[in-house]
């Protein structure tokens, strides 16, 4: 592999480790020319997940878009980004485990709601109101009464 510092063509590996549940290989490399060290990561190239939108359009799954939606739901709640990232990781793993390459945005929304229900009731209601397109106070009241019963 080419050295990012001096451009020398032939670097060598000094350490190799598996990370992220053995899905990524981290390699520590050294350049014999300039003696600088650097890290590379080797990942399995997975088939992209396509999301089928409400209007029938298909677009690639966007982790950042889902993260932004979760962040809006947890505004001013004591929930750190690591928990949100873990939710997204679990959802992606669940989709991959099913062996599907296409999923509706509605199904993703259901998965998010299941995770938020266990994490934070306020975030759950916020996300549900957008995901289920609430247009009246009655819809909020109905959701809240269902939550009280559970």
UniProtKB/Swiss-Prot annotation:
ZnF unnamed residues are 3-34
Q: What is the free-text note on the cofactor? A: Binds 1 zinc ion.
In this chain the ATP-cone domain maps to 49-139
Q: Name one Pfam family in it.
A: ATP-cone
Carries keyword tRNA-binding? no
List the cofactors. Answer: Zn(2+)
Q: Which InterPro entries does this chain map to?
A: ATP-cone_dom, NrdR-like_N, RNR_NrdR-like
Record keywords: ATP-binding, DNA-binding, Metal-binding, Nucleotide-binding, Repressor, Transcription, Transcription regulation, Zinc, Zinc-finger
Gene Ontology molecular function? ATP binding; DNA binding; zinc ion binding
Q: Which GO terms describe its biological process?
A: negative regulation of DNA-templated transcription
NCBIfam families tied to this protein: transcriptional regulator NrdR
What is its biological role?
A: Negatively regulates transcription of bacterial ribonucleotide reductase nrd genes and operons by binding to NrdR-boxes.
Entry's family note:
Belongs to the NrdR family.
Q: What is this protein called?
A: Transcriptional repressor NrdR
Q: Which organism is it from?
A: Dictyoglomus thermophilum (strain ATCC 35947 / DSM 3960 / H-6-12)
Q: Which gene encodes it?
A: nrdR
């Amino acid at each position: 592999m080419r050295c990012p510092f001096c451009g020398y063509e032939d670097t060598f590996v000094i350490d190799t480790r598996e990370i992220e549940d053995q899905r990524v290989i981290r390699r520590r490399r050294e350049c014999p020319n300039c003696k600088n060290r650097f890290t590379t990561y080797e990942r399995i190239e997975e088939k992209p997940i396509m999301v089928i939108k409400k209007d029938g359009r298909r677009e690639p799954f966007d982790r950042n878009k889902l993260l932004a939606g979760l962040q809006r739901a947890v505004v001013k709640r004591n929930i750190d980004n690591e928990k949100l990232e873990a939710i997204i990781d679990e959802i992606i793993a669940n989709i991959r485990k099913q062996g599907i390459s296409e999923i509706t945005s509605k199904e993703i929304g259901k998965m998010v709601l299941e995770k938020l229900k266990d994490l934070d009731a306020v975030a759950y209601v916020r996300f549900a109101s957008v995901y289920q397109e609430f247009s009246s106070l009655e819809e909020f009241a109905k959701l809240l009464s269902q939550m009280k019963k559970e």
